[in-house]
Amino acid sequence: MNESELKLQFGKPLQITPRLHIKQPTIKEIEKMDGKYEKYLSLLITQSRDIADVLWVKANIFYEDIKSEWLFFIKNCIVDGEAAPIYILKNDSYIQMNDAGLVINKEYTDALNYFFETDGIWFTSSITACGIQQLVLINAKEKHGIYYLDSNDKPLQINESVYNNMVDGLAKLNWIKKEYQFTKGGTKDATTYFLEMEYRKRIKKKKDRITISTIFSSLVAKGHRYKDVKKYPVYFFYESYFRLLKISEYENTMQALYNGCIDTKNHPINYEKIDWSSIIK
C-alpha cells in the first residue's frame, strides 16, 4: 500500500494487492447509503481491542487471550454462516469442491463486496501455501442459487496478510487512529478494572461527539462550499477537517503571541509543530 497522499486526495481507490483495491466513496455517496457505510466500516475494522471492554464484561474473555485478529474476524464472519456446496465450473460442468468451508454471513459479505467492489459470496477454505496451511476467504460467483468458481479464472482470496492490509487501509482512508488507554494498566487486574470502567462509559454514551455530519457542518461553517463538500472523497474530507484544526491552532497561537499571552523565553513556540501546511500525523 504505497498510494501517495495526493492520489488519495483525488479520490483514487487504495490498492492493497495487485487484484484487490478499497473503494473510496464521496460524502454524497456515503449519505445515500443511509448509515450502511459506517456499519460496513465497523464490521471490517473492529478488532478485539476495540471491543475489549465488551468481551470482558459480557463474555469474560480477556483480549490478550485472542492470539489472532484474523481468526477472530473469521469467527465473526461465520456467525449464522451457511454450509452450502461450492462448485468449480469446468467445460460447462459443475464439479463440487471437497475443501470448501462455510459461506460467510450476509452482513460481512455485503461489507467486503462494497469496499472491494466485488460481487457474489465469500466462503472459508483451508489451503496450503509454501508448505504452510492457511485459512482464507475465497470469492465465488453466484448463478441461479449455485455458488461456483470458474476454472478459467483465478479466484480472489483474502488471507491474513491481505486482511491486515485491509484494516490498515480502511483506517487510513477514514483517518482512524486507534488508542487504547486500558493497555497502560500494567497487571491483568488493573487492566480488567479499566475495561469495566470503559464498559460503563460505553453504555452511558448515546452517540459519537464528532461524526461525518458534524465535520460536514464545520467545513461549511469555515467557508467550504456546501456543494463542493458533498463531492469530497472520504480521505480528503477528513484531511480537510484535521487541516482546519491545525490552522485554528496556528491562528490561536499567533493571536496569543500578539496579545503577549505567551512567555516565549520560558516557553518557546515550536513553529514546526504548529505549521498548518505540514504533514498531519
Each language-model region and where it sits:
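Long, intrinsically disordered, low-complexity Ser/Thr/Pro-rich regulatory/activation regions
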Residues: 257-281
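Hydrophobic, aromatic-lined core segments that form the binding pocket/scaffold
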Residues: 92-204, 208
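An amphipathic, hydrophobic-aromatic interaction surface with interspersed Lys/Arg
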Residues: 1-77, 164-253
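General structural signal for secondary-structure boundaries
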Residues: 26, 108, 119-120, 128, ...
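Protein-protein interaction interfaces in oligomeric scaffolds
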Residues: 35-37, 42, 48, 53-127, ...
